[in-house]
A protein has these predicted regions:
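Alpha/beta-hydrolase active-site loop
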Residues: 79-99
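Alpha/beta-hydrolase-fold enzymes
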Residues: 121-207
């Protein structure tokens, strides 16, 4: 296996950081990964190693305001203006780079949590640039009222604190609800994984667990509003294979809302949607005690849909 880290220049001349894991030979397929909120791409090194062993390369970018990319901006902040679209453009830039390096190899896009919402929005614009989709710990809420209410709170906090302000109220309203599902509460991050070692690693990582800015929350909530309607999902190629997976004990989607997301894609016309719910797992199946099983399922799904098996 080989690992390298490099920088790419985005459409607005900002630079973003990329981690790349690959087999020693030319890979049979490529995965481009979009991580979640308040984490970074290096956390997926174990996935990169497993994929490389299976002959698959992994490219994972640090989102704006995250990981090493944050050195060119504000931590936990996509941008003052149009930040969500700028991140989508970064993903497209990485896709161009992959195409230049690997030409006709099949490319799969992987999004975890917040990254899964970005991936769905990316597909609304650039679905022809990938051959398959993997959504980890995503969510689907049809209630426009809930989004509007959350946006009102976020906009009030932006007015009060500024675009780069950090709202402890927003952070508490969203993450305290996740944490309440688990007792006794040993850390503030118990909802991420049942593996205490992995939770401790997250808590001790200086690039994880920070409070995002009010503007990032507005960007994310606005993006969620756009990707939810079935009338928008029909714009995505209905022949695109999609794998949706998560832990049954994830307080974000609670299991059933992953099924709702799969059904939304099916209702939009896609008949190539697979769903996997893992018992006893929480928000980060890739960082659970039985994560090798999850990773093997991903590898088998990629090989099947890339016609490598």
């Amino acid at each position: 296996m080989r690992h390298e880290a490099f920088w790419l220049t985005a459409s607005d001349s900002t630079e973003f950081h990329v981690n790349h894991w690959s087999p020693t030979q030319e890979p049979q397929a490529i995965v481009m990964l979009v991580h979640g909120m308040a984490e970074h791409s290096k956390r997926y090194a174990h996935l990169g190693a497993a994929l490389a062993k299976a002959g698959i390369a992994l490219y994972a970018l640090d989102l704006r305001g995250h990981g090493f990319t944050a050195s060119f901006g504000v931590k936990g902040h996509f941008g003052n203006h149009n930040g969500w679209q700028l991140v989508l453009d970064d993903i497209r830039c990485l896709n161009h780079h992959i195409r230049q390096q690997h030409h006709e190899k099949p490319v799969f896009i992987f999004g975890h949590s917040l990254g899964s919402y970005l991936v769905i929005d990316y597909l609304l614009q650039y679905c022809c640039s990938v051959q398959g989709v993997i959504l980890s710990s995503s969510n689907y809420i049809q209630s426009t009222f809930r989004y509007k209410l959350a946006l009102q709170v976020a906009r009030f906090e932006r007015w009060r604190l500024g675009k780069q302000g950090r709202s402890k109220l927003l952070h508490w309203l969203i993450f305290n609800r996740h944490q309440r599902a688990f007792k006794p509460q040993k850390t503030l991050h118990d909802w991420l994984s049942s593996d205490e070692k992995q939770v401790k690693l997250y808590a001790q990582d200086p690039l994880c667990g920070f409070i995002s800015t009010t503007q990032l929350w507005i960007d994310a909530l606005t993006g969620l509003q756009r990707i939810t309607p079935i009338s928008n999902l029909v714009q995505i190629d209905n022949l695109l294979p999609i794998l949706i997976f998560g832990g049954e004990h994830d307080p974000i989607h609670q299991g059933h809302r992953l099924i709702d997301l799969a059904n939304a894609f099916r209702e939009s016309g896609n008949r190539f949607v697979d769903v996997k719910l893992y018992p006893d797992m929480r928000h980060e199946p890739l960082n659970e005690k039985n994560s090798p099983r999850v990773i093997q399922d991903i590898i088998e799904w990629i090989k099947h849909n890339a016609r490598l098996d």
